C-alpha cells in the first residue's frame, strides 16, 4: 500500500518541518485546490497578485522537492473540488493518504467525504504552521486562565508568555507587565506625513 502525501497551497513547509518522515512517502501530490483559487461552494474574490504568487510558490515547492529526489506530482487547478481525490482514487486506488491538518472546515469536510466514498485511509498530522498545538489549546481552555470560558487576549497572552518563557524572569514578566498594549494605541501625529 502506497504512502501518499497531499500538499495543499497553505502547506509549503520545508522538509525538516514536515510532521511525517519525508522518506516514508512514496509520492507527494501538490494540488492547486479549488478552495484556494476559485470554488463554486465558497465564492471568494481573490486578488490576482495573490493567485500569481501562490502558484509561483507552489511551482517552486515542486522543484524544491524534486531537486531533493522525491517523486512529486503537480495537479493544476481545474475548478473541480474533487480533483485530488479522483486523481488518487484513479491512479493509486486504496492507499495511506497523509494529510497535514488543512485548518479549513470545508476542506476537512471534503476530505472526510472522500474517505467515506472511496474507503480511503486518511492519516492526519498536526500543522507545523502554528506555534501552539491543538493539545496546547485544550490545556489552556482547561487551565485556571481559561476555566471560566471567557477568553480574553490579556489572559491568553500572559499564559502564552509563561508557557514559552518569553520575556520572563522566573515566574514574573520582565518589566513587571505582561502587556504594553496601551502604549501601542496612540494615533499617528498630524505632523507626520505618510505617502502611499
Swiss-Prot record:
Q: Which organism is it from?
A: Acanthamoeba polyphaga mimivirus (APMV)
What InterPro entries has UniProt attached to this entry? PhrB-like, Rossmann-like_a/b/a_fold, UV-DNA_repair_photolyase
Protein name per Swiss-Prot or TrEMBL: Uncharacterized protein R852
Q: Which domain of life is it from?
A: Viruses
Amino acid at each position: 500500500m502506497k504512502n501518499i502525501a497531499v500538499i495543499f497551497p497553505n502547506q509549503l513547509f520545508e522538509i525538516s518541518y514536515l510532521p511525517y518522515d519525508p522518506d516514508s512517502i512514496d509520492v507527494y501530490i501538490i494540488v492547486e485546490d479549488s478552495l484556494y483559487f476559485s470554488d463554486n461552494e465558497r465564492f471568494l474574490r481573490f486578488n490576482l497578485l495573490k493567485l500569481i504568487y501562490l502558484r509561483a510558490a507552489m511551482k517552486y515547492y515542486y522543484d524544491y522537492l524534486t531537486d531533493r529526489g522525491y517523486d512529486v506530482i503537480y495537479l493544476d487547478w481545474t475548478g473541480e473540488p474533487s480533483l485530488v481525490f479522483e486523481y488518487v482514487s484513479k491512479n493509486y486506488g486504496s492507499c495511506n493518504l497523509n494529510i497535514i491538518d488543512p485548518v479549513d472546515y470545508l476542506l476537512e469536510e471534503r476530505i472526510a467525504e472522500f474517505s467515506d466514498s472511496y474507503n480511503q485511509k486518511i492519516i492526519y498530522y498536526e500543522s507545523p504552521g502554528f506555534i501552539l498545538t491543538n493539545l496546547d489549546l485544550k490545556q489552556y481552555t482547561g487551565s485556571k486562565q481559561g476555566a471560566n470560558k471567557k477568553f480574553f487576549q490579556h489572559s491568553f497572552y500572559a499564559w502564552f508568555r509563561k508557557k514559552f518563557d518569553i520575556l520572563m524572569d522566573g515566574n514574573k514578566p520582565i518589566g513587571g507587565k505582561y502587556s504594553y498594549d496601551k502604549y501601542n494605541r496612540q494615533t499617528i501625529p498630524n505632523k507626520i506625513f505618510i505617502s502611499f
